[in-house]
Structure formats: structure tokens, C-alpha cells
Curated annotation (Swiss-Prot):
Residues 607-609 are annotated as: G5. Residues 145-155, 219-234, 270-283 have a biased composition (Low complexity). The lineage of its organism: Bacteria, Pseudomonadati, Pseudomonadota, Betaproteobacteria, Neisseriales. It comes from Neisseria meningitidis serogroup B (strain ATCC BAA-335 / MC58). SUPFAM superfamilies: Initiation factor IF2/eIF5b, domain 3, P-loop containing nucleoside triphosphate hydrolases, Putative DNA-binding domain, Translation proteins. Residues 117-141, 173-216, 235-269, 314-327, 338-354 have a biased composition (Basic and acidic residues). This is Translation initiation factor IF-2.
Length: 962
């Protein structure tokens, strides 16, 4: 006979391929799949294995059972069985017989095998005859017992449930076995009544196959078929194993319950009141769950039956101490349903676990308790930055984002998971969820800058003082510096006024002094504030012939706000109108008291033009510096402040940096606000290239990624990555702040303009050479706005006028102001083609005056009355269908046909209107001059009397100005 495959052989035997492969493997035949070929020798080995395995006891014969009675137990879930049907399962002996028959048909058998098979067949025939008689007697007894159980009262319902769970399995048992099993079931816990009987009823092939064939639909009851019956000796052995298994389960359950109670008490001592209640409820649930397996009629334990008694005892201690991985192996092992159900009872598993391959997929929880023990809540310390998204806040608190959204909804805020919330709201949410919130910029990379600075410690050495020269416009600040520097800076300033912050360092016999020259014009308030911030000493210049002016008072306020000492230089004492004493009195009124009057401020009378007392002024400055004991580390990364910044067409972003500490070197990575970059070049105030600059030295630097804002702090970092990270973070933060301000301004303007007429708007685009200039110009122009005409600065920036500026002006109807900058050729051509006006200025006065004139032209003209003449009514003539006609004499001026008139009676205005007609004799005339008579009628008014006067006037429109 040719070889057959495992799958074909399984079909002949009517067995699953998986079971046949397993049996072949146990018999020593290695087959991996159903397509593997199966030889005659393989079949003989399988036959010998099955014969040896199932025929180990001479008196043991597996039986085939037919179900003739069906249990109808209320509340018992039966998932794999059909009611009222016969379940026919082939036994291992039948499988062996089928294998033998197939082998007999395929090839001649050996003599010794034939003799053995013949003896086996005779024994089976005798056993079948005996089994038939016993089965019939057992069926009759079972029917009688069931009829008696139905007659019992309802009070014995639990006992009935135990008795009715067994008939399916008890059909094929002897009477003695049934009584012994019932007595044993009464001793077991109530949740395991059906297991021992089902264990005794299940044949070995069902245990080996894990109950797969039990799921097949049962056939209708057939005529009595001879069935093999187990011997009394094997039955007694099975009873003993079942009793031991029941005792083992009862002991395990008692240990489990005791362990659970012990664990629950230990957890309850650690938790608060609300966790204690929860733990008690969960522990109660865990103690009740072992009763659930009573609903599982399939929960027999053939695993115990299939093994000797001693190995079961040995596993008792092993199961008690096994870990989670061991439980999983036991659930998937050969033990079948019994092992799984015990594990399910231990873990409080309410779901039914099916046998076979499904049992291998059983996934046990790592914790063998019925509930997850509650843990003590963890309180986090959450650092909340200025703004934070809901998702980030939830991540910091280790909670789900939906919890934060719920908390915000309770507060009346409808937010999404990616929406940003402010710091105050976030702190409230953190406290609401039981954590500790602290306001801090935890995610701010700038928080690490201070740590890095503290790590670098260098010796602090004396440094030159930084002196800021402040005062009113045209009081001689720049001229004073010119004399000190021996230069003519003032001649280079447009209009003779300073419009930038100039930074210079001067070497004197007593040391180096760094000077900052600030603008005195009122438009440059921000520049003066920056100058005071970066300075050590302030020289307040006051003209002796002019006195204290508004910007002088402002400079005093800046110096006091910055907390820096002042030295007053009373300039222009060489003029005839100079009055230094008056200056001292006026400054004393502003709490600037001279030292000779008992104050703490030095007053020096100087003349910048003639150089009088300049050395005394420098001595006073150095004296103040000695008192301050100014020091700074030299061998350290540089830190400083951006004094001024601009965009140069050929060199890019150019910034004037005042080094405050450390040494700035060419090639350093510098971070200044939102700009960063490697310093490509350093230039001093004289235009000379240098490679390094120490404390208190001003330098111009090139190489930044963008034009930084004036007044920003600058510092040298170790690597570009950190500088880029901080710069990008600042850009995002500034963008959020700017958008928030714009939104607030839009809302504010919307409410302010509600109900008002639309005002005229003058749109302007400002481009300047440095940031301070366009800040000053934009601020000054905005101050010109009135309720009727407003200045709208669409864009302001540093650098020349580009095509994008012209395109913006085209779209918005604006004009462009270039302050010390020019437009390139392409921009000029585009502006000419599109009729865009570009105005160039180098003096801030001129720009402000021109814009003021343009705004004045946009104002609606003012209407004024101009009296042209006076008329006296001397006669009133009434004409029918026409009205009253006044005969008048022009007493003053002239009366015109289109004039407005005002009727006056007894010096009281009675009527104001227009003339309907003006005649002299019978002719219509345009005007009548003084001394002539005329006749006239008023339009729509006839109540005139003799003696009334008419005042003639014209309405004239007069242009307004700001």
C-alpha cells in the first residue's frame, strides 16, 4: 500500500489532525503537519503506543456512553452541549481498532501482532456483553432517582441542583460509584458540585483531546448499543483521585481566601478613608467570585485523573508558590479544563474558558487577586510656565488630558486638548486635581542660562565707567562730547541734533571712560530710557541760558528710575545770558540738590565751545566711579546690551553692543533676544576692525541672523544649537504675545468705535536706518492722531525701501517715509508706475511737520458766518397770492440775492432763512449796495413788520489745521 498523509489518515479515523499529530509525536513519530506522509511502520508504532497506553491495566476497558437523560438545572450555563441528544465519542480502544483494521487491509501483519489482537478482540466482545447489561440497569435506576428528586419540596433546591448536575455524567456509572460521588460532592464546597462526577465520566481520550469532540452535535438516541464498562478496580482508583483533587481544590481555595484577606488588611492600613471603602468593596467582590465556577458544568479535572497520585501531591506545593509565568503554563498544559478552572477561580475570572486550542490563548492577569489593589495617590510638583497647552499640563500631572478638560469645563472654559491656557488658570487646575503648582518657566530654555553663568566663575577686575550724557535738545550734549573726543560729531548730525545713540570710549590720563550720547528730542524717550539702563553714571547737561526744560526733567526721572548717580554739567556759561544759580534753584525743585548746598550731586559749570572746566567734569565722573567700585570679570563669556541696531544693505544686521562683563571675541556665538549668530566682524566707534572687546567697551558687531531689538540683553553661548533653541523659543513666545496684543487691540477698537462715525485714516510706511529712529518717528506720528484723522503706521522697519514696501503701499493706499534711507532702482520704478509717494527725510522735525500738514488737509473744513450787510424794513406791502413784500433801505454793506438773512426784532432773532427775491423797482437784481432802496421777500416766511431789521450773511468754509 502506498504511503498516506497524516490528514488522510485522520479523516479515515475521524479524528482531528492536531490530535493525531500529538499522538504520533507521543508515539515517537515526528510529523509536523497534515501533509506529511505516513508509512506502515509509523502506523504500527502508533498502534503499539496506543495499545500500551490504554491497556496498562488488564481489566481497564474504555466505554462509549449514550446520553438518554438530560439535566435541566436552572441557571447553569452549558455552552458546548446540546440537550436531549446523545454524545458519541470514539474511545482510544476504538481508535486502536481502526488503526489495526487499516493496517490489516493495507498489508499482512506479523504473527505475534495477530495473536495479540485476537486476544484483545475476545476480551472486548466479553466486555461489551457485560457493559450492555450494566448500562440498562443503571439507566433504570437513574430514571427512578430522577423521579424521586422532582417530588422534593422547593426548600431542598440547592440539593437538587447538586443532584441534577450529575446525571449527564452518571448515566454510565455503577450504582456504587454514583453514591460515593454524591457523598463526596456533599463534603466539597458548594461552588464545585459538578466537577467530581464529570471527571469520573470523561474518558481518557476526551482528556487527551481537551474535549474537542464533545463540542460536536449529538445524534438522536439510537437503539441499545453494546458499550464497554470500566472495571471496579479502575473505578475505585478514579474515585480516590477525584476525592484527592477535591480536597486539593478546597485547600487551595482556603489558602487563597486567607491570603486575599491578609492582603486586603495590609492595604487598608495604608490608605485613606475613601481608598479604604473602595478596598473593602473590591475585597468583598474578590471573596465572592470563587463561587462563580459552580455555573461551569464542564469544569472537570481530567488532569488529576490522568496523572498518578504522588505527582499531584508534589504539585500542591509548587502551585502554592508558583509565579505568574507558571500560572500561564498550567493554564495551557495537558491538565485541560481542571487546571484552567482552578486558575480562573483563583483570579476571579467570570468568563467561561473553552478547552482545546482556545485554552492556550487564556491570558491571566499578573496579579492573582480578584482586584487591583488601590495605591496611594502620587502628588506631583508641577512647574507651570506663562502659557501651557492642556496636553502638556496633563502630561506634567501624569493624568489623562480629558481629566484636565473636564476640570476646565467645570470652571466654565470650553477648551481643546491642544489649546493654550494662561498660567493662573493652569495653577487653579493643578490644585483642583490635587497636585502642587508652582509658577515657573520650566520649559523655558532660558532657565538654563543662569545655571551656566553661575558655573563660570572668574576674577572680577576693575572696569571703566559707562557714562550717559542726557539733557534737553540743543543744550550742548554732543558738543560737550566733541570737545572731550576732540572730534566734530555734531557737524555730521542732520539738523545739528542727535538722532542716534552714540557710544564712544575715551582714554584720559586717569583711565578709560565710555560715553553714551542720547538724543534730547522728545521723540527719543525710549532711547534715553535704554541709555539710562546701560549706564553707571549720568551727566545731565543743562544750558545756563535756557534753564530746565521738559526733556531735562525726563532725563532726571530716567536716572532716578535706573538708580544711577548724576553729575550736572551747566553748559554755555560763556554766554552773556547765562545764569548758573537759576539752574541750581530750578533743579533743586526737582530734588537734584548741589553738593555745596548740602546735597549729593556735583554741579560743574562748563563751556563745551571754549572747553572751560572739561577736566573738572571728567574728574567728577571718575570720582563717582571710584565710589561705585565698578568691577567685572574679564576671563569669562561676554555679556552686554544692544544699544542700537540697524540693517545695512551690504553687511546685513549690524548691532552696537556695549560689553558689560567678560570679553567678546571674534567668532563667538552670540544670542541677542530673538537673534543669534557667530560674530563675523567687530568694529570700534572709529571704524577700526578689532578682534576682542573687554568690559565697558562699545563695539559694532556683524553676523547676527536678524536685527535685534535695541535694549535686548546679549550673551555668548557655548554652541549654536543652544542659541538656536533659545532664539526660536523666544520668537514663538513673542509671536504669541504680539498676537494676543493685536487681538486685544482689535476688540478695544471695535468697542471704542461702536456708534461713532468712521474717522479719516492716513496710512504710513516708515523705513529708517536704525531701530531707535523708526520707533521715535512712529511714536511721534501716532501722537498726532485726532478723533477725525488717525495716523495708521502699517509697517516700520530698518533698512532701505524695497519692492515689498511699495507693494504694501499700493495695496493699502499709503505713502512711504524714508528716514536716512533710500529706495533702490526697482522700488523707485515701481513706485513711479503705481503713483506711490515716497518722501525722504533726515530730520525728524520735517517728517512730523509734513505728516501734520497732510493730516490737516484731510480735516473737514470749518464753516464760518461772514456778515455782508444790514437792511431796515420801512414798509410792508401785502399782495394777494404772493405774500408780504418788504420795502427796505440798505443801511450797511451789501445785500446779495443768494445771501442768508436773519430777521431781528427788538434785538431778538426771529427767523433765519434765505431771500426769495430781490428787486429794485420792477427789475430783479443780484445785489443792492448801501444807501439804496430795494424790495425783497423772504422764502417761506411772511411775518414781517415795519421797523424789523435784516442781517445778511454768507457761510464761508475755512480750512482747519492741527
Amino acid at each position: 500500500m502506498s504511503n498516506t498523509t497524516v490528514e488522510q489518515f485522520a479523516a479515515e479515523l475521524k479524528r482531528p489532525v492536531e490530535d493525531l499529530l500529538k499522538q504520533l509525536k507521543e508515539a515517537g513519530v515526528s510529523k509536523n503537519s497534515g501533509s506529511d506522509s505516513l508509512t506502515l511502520d509509523d502506523k504500527q508504532l502508533l498502534n503499539a503506543y496506543l495499545t500500551k497506553k490504554n491497556g496498562s491495566n488488564s481489566s481497564t476497558i474504555s466505554i462509549r456512553r449514550t446520553k438518554t437523560e438530560v439535566s435541566t438545572v436552572d441557571g447553569v450555563k452549558v455552552e458546548t452541549r446540546k440537550r436531549g441528544r446523545t454524545v458519541k465519542i470514539p474511545s482510544a480502544e476504538e481508535l486502536a481498532a481502526q488503526v489495526k483494521a487499516a493496517q490489516t487491509q493495507a498489508a499482512p501483519v506479523r504473527p505475534e501482532q495477530t495473536a495479540e489482537d485476537a486476544a484483545k478482540a475476545r476480551a472486548e466482545a466479553a466486555a461489551r456483553a457485560e457493559a450492555r447489561a450494566k448500562a440498562e440497569a443503571e439507566a433504570a435506576k437513574l430514571k427512578a432517582a430522577k423521579a424521586g428528586n422532582k417530588a422534593k419540596p422547593a426548600a431542598q433546591k440547592p440539593t437538587e441542583a447538586k443532584a441534577e448536575t450529575a446525571p449527564v455524567a452518571a448515566e454510565t456509572k455503577p450504582a456504587e460509584e454514583s453514591k460515593a460521588e454524591k457523598a463526596q460532592a456533599d463534603k466539597m464546597p458548594s461552588e464545585k458540585p459538578a466537577e467530581p462526577k464529570e471527571k469520573a465520566a470523561k474518558p481518557k481520550h476526551e482528556r487527551n483531546g481537551k474535549g474537542k469532540d464533545a463540542k460536536k452535535p449529538a445524534k438522536p438516541a439510537a437503539p441499545a448499543v453494546p458499550q464497554p464498562v470500566v472495571s471496579a478496580e479502575e473505578q475505585a482508583q478514579r474515585d480516590e483521585e477525584a476525592r484527592r483533587a477535591a480536597a486539593l481544590r478546597a485547600h487551595q481555595e482556603a489558602l487563597l481566601k486567607e491570603k486575599q484577606e491578609r492582603q486586603a488588611r495590609r492595604e487598608a492600613m495604608k490608605q485613606q478613608a475613601e481608598q479604604q471603602a473602595k478596598a473593602a468593596q473590591e475585597a468583598k467582590t474578590g471573596r465572592q467570585r470563587p463561587a462563580k465556577p459552580a455555573e461551569k458544568p464542564q469544569a472537570a479535572a481530567p488532569a488529576v485523573e490522568n496523572k498518578p497520585v504522588n505527582p499531584a501531591k508534589a504539585k500542591k506545593e509548587d502551585r502554592r508558590n508558583r509565579d505568574d509565568e507558571g500560572q500561564g503554563r498550567n493554564a495551557k498544559g495537558k491538565g485541560g479544563k481542571g487546571g484552567r478552572d482552578r486558575n480562573n477561580a483563583r483570579n476571579g475570572d467570570d468568563e467561561r474558558v473553552r478547552g482545546g486550542k482556545k485554552g492556550k490563548k487564556l491570558k491571566l492577569e499578573p496579579n492573582q487577586h480578584a482586584f487591583q489593589a488601590p495605591t496611594e495617590p502620587v502628588v506631583h510638583e508641577v512647574l507651570v510656565p506663562e502659557t501651557i497647552t492642556v496636553a502638556d499640563l496633563a502630561h506634567k500631572m501624569a493624568v489623562k488630558g480629558v481629566e484636565v478638560v473636564k476640570a476646565l469645563m467645570k470652571m466654565g472654559m470650553m477648551v481643546t486638548i491642544n489649546q493654550s491656557i494662561d498660567q493662573d488658570t493652569a495653577l487653579i487646575v493643578v490644585e483642583e486635581l490635587g497636585h502642587i503648582g508652582k509658577p515657573a518657566a520650566a520649559d523655558d530654555p532660558e532657565a538654563f542660562l543662569d545655571e551656566g553663568a553661575e558655573a563660570v566663575e572668574a576674577e572680577a577686575l576693575p572696569r571703566p565707567p559707562v557714562v550717559t550724557v542726557m539733557g534737553h535738545v540743543d543744550h550742548g550734549k554732543t558738543s560737550l562730547l566733541d570737545y572731550i573726543r576732540r572730534t566734530k560729531v555734531v557737524q555730521g548730525e542732520a539738523g545739528g541734533i542727535t538722532q542716534h545713540i552714540g557710544a564712544y570710549h575715551v582714554e584720559t590720563p586717569r583711565g578709560v571712560i565710555t560715553f553714551l550720547d542720547t538724543p534730547g528730542h522728545e521723540a527719543f524717550t525710549a532711547m534715553r530710557a535704554r541709555g539710562a539702563k546701560a549706564t553707571d553714571i549720568v551727566i545731565l547737561v543743562v544750558a545756563a541760558d535756557d534753564g530746565v526744560m521738559p526733556q531735562t526733567i525726563e532725563a532726571i526721572a530716567h536716572a532716578k528710575a535706573a538708580g544711577v548717580p548724576m553729575v550736572v554739567a551747566v553748559n554755555k556759561i560763556d554766554k552773556e545770558a547765562a545764569n548758573p544759580e537759576r539752574i541750581r534753584q530750578e533743579l533743586t525743585a526737582h530734588e537734584v540738590v548741589p553738593d555745596e548746598w548740602g546735597g549729593d550731586v556735583q554741579f560743574i559749570d562748563v563751556s563745551a565751545k571754549k572747553g572751560l572746566n572739561i577736566d573738572a567734569l571728567l574728574e567728577a565722573v571718575l570720582l563717582e566711579a571710584e565710589v561705585l567700585e565698578l568691577t567685572a570679570p574679564v576671563d569669562a563669556p561676554a555679556k552686554g546690551i544692544i544699544v542700537e541696531a540697524r540693517l545695512d544693505k551690504g553687511r546685513g544686521a549690524v548691532a552696537t553692543l556695549l560689553v558689560q562683563s567678560g570679553t567678546l571675541k571674534k567668532g563667538d556665538m552670540l544670542l541677542a533676544g530673538t537673534a543669534f549668530g557667530k560674530i563675523r566682524a567687530m568694529v570700534d566707534e572709529n571704524g577700526k576692525s578689532i578682534t576682542e572687546a573687554g568690559p565697558s567697551i562699545p563695539v559694532e558687531i556683524l553676523g547676527l541672523s536678524d536685527v535685534p531689538n535695541a535694549g535686548e540683553d546679549a550673551m555668548v553661548l557655548a554652541d549654536e544649537k543652544k542659541a538656536r533653541e533659545i532664539a526660536l523659543f523666544r520668537q514663538g513666545k513673542y509671536r504669541d504675545v504680539r498676537l494676543a496684543k493685536q487681538q486685544a487691540a482689535k476688540l478695544e477698537n471695535m468697542f471704542n468705535n461702536m456708534g461713532e462715525t468712521q474717522a479719516q485714516s492716513l496710512s504710513v510706511i516708515i523705513k529708517a536706518d536704525v531701530q531707535g529712529s523708526y520707533e521715535a518717528l512712529a511714536g511721534s506720528l501716532k501722537k498726532l492722531s485726532t478723533d477725525e484723522v488717525k495716523v495708521n503706521v502699517l509697517h516700520s522697519g530698518v533698512g532701505g525701501i524695497t519692492e515689498s514696501d511699495v507693494n504694501l503701499a499700493i495695496a493699502s493706499g499709503a505713502f512711504i517715509i524714508g528716514f536716512n534711507v533710500r529706495a533702490d532702482a526697482s522700488s523707485r520704478k515701481l513706485a513711479e508706475n503705481e503713483n506711490v509717494e515716497i518722501r525722504y527725510y533726515n530730520i525728524i522735525y520735517d517728517a512730523i511737520n509734513d505728516v501734520k500738514a497732510a493730516m490737516s488737509g484731510m480735516l473737514s473744513p470749518e464753516e464760518k458766518e461772514q456778515v455782508t450787510g444790514t437792511v431796515e424794513i420801512r414798509q410792508v406791502i401785502s399782495v394777494s397770492k404772493v405774500g408780504n413784500i418788504a420795502g427796505c433801505m440798505v443801511t450797511d454793506g451789501v445785500v446779495k440775492r443768494d445771501s442768508h438773512v436773519r430777521l431781528i426784532r427788538n434785538n431778538v432773532v426771529i427767523h433765519t432763512g434765505e431771500l426769495a427775491s430781490l428787486k429794485r423797482y420792477k427789475d430783479d437784481v443780484k445785489e443792492v449796495r448801501m444807501g439804496f432802496e430795494c424790495g425783497l421777500m423772504l422764502k417761506g416766511y411772511n411775518e414781517i413788520m415795519e421797523g424789523d431789521q435784516l442781517e445778511c450773511f454768507d457761510i464761508v468754509e475755512v480750512a482747519r489745521s492741527l
